[in-house]
């Protein structure tokens, strides 16, 4: 959640009125872009974190601030949170495949330091996506219509929080049309959540509401 503010934007080019209307009514014309994948995996061995940061590049360990060591690599760009138990959390990649590649690179680095690792249990814990529906949304009207699923406190946070039951994904919806999706474990769930929310957002399009 801490990285949700770093939302990627998609290029948009103005087209004819006909194509714009077609896009508004077809969620397949846009889709969420993955901006962060969080995964976990195990190395099957206890780790001495001070030893790791002494021998590895781009690694730090301050137990007064955080219980794990932090390591970064540039390709694929990512950050690993390394714990004494041998559990590692990988974050910052833009796809599941990148996350797998990064996790194996971290495992290889620790193996080279001298640990008899056993790489296992790679699991995606969270996929964060973002998109822009290209129209403004009447958040107050939306929350009134879907009160059971929504939380909206504009004095605390400018976005509406929509908790979808199936798939189990949380969406942050902004009046500008920006949408952030979090909690998906696979791309299918991410895209399905967007497909489900799109007609709801379209029904609460600010221009349409104001003309009623």
UniProtKB/Swiss-Prot annotation:
GO terms for biological process: DNA-templated transcription initiation; positive regulation of transcription initiation by RNA polymerase II; transcription by RNA polymerase II. PROSITE patterns: TFIID. InterPro entries: TBP (IPR000814), TBP_CS (IPR030491), TBP_dom_sf (IPR012295), TBP_eukaryotic (IPR033710). It is found in: Nucleus. It comes from the Eukaryota. Keywords: DNA-binding, Nucleus, Repeat, Transcription, Transcription regulation. Disulfide bonds: none annotated. GO terms for cellular component: nucleus. This is TATA-box-binding protein 2. It comes from Entamoeba histolytica (strain ATCC 30459 / HM-1:IMSS / ABRM).
């Amino acid at each position: 959640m801490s990285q949700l503010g770093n939302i990627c934007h998609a290029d948009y080019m103005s087209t004819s009125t006909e194509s714009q209307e077609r896009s508004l009514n077809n969620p397949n014309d846009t889709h969420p872009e993955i901006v962060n994948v969080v995964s976990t995996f195990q190395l099957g061995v206890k780790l001495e974190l001070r030893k790791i940061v002494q021998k590895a590049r781009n690694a730090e360990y301050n137990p007064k601030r955080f219980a794990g060591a932090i390591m970064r690599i540039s390709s694929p760009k990512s950050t690993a949170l390394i714990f004494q138990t041998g559990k590692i959390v990988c974050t910052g990649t833009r796809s599941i495949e990148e996350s797998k590649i990064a996790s194996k690179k971290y495992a290889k680095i620790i193996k080279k330091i001298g640990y008899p690792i056993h790489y296992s249990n790679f699991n995606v814990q969270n996929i964060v996506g973002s998109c822009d529906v290209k129209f403004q949304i009447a958040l107050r009207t939306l929350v009134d219509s879907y009160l059971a699923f929504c939380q909206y406190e504009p004095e605390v946070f400018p976005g509406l929080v929509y908790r979808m039951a199936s798939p189990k994904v949380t969406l942050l919806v902004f009046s500008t049309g920006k949408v952030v999706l979090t909690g998906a474990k696979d791309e299918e769930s991410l895209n399905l959540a967007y497909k489900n929310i799109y007609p709801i957002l379209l029904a609460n399009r600010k221009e349409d509401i104001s003309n009623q």
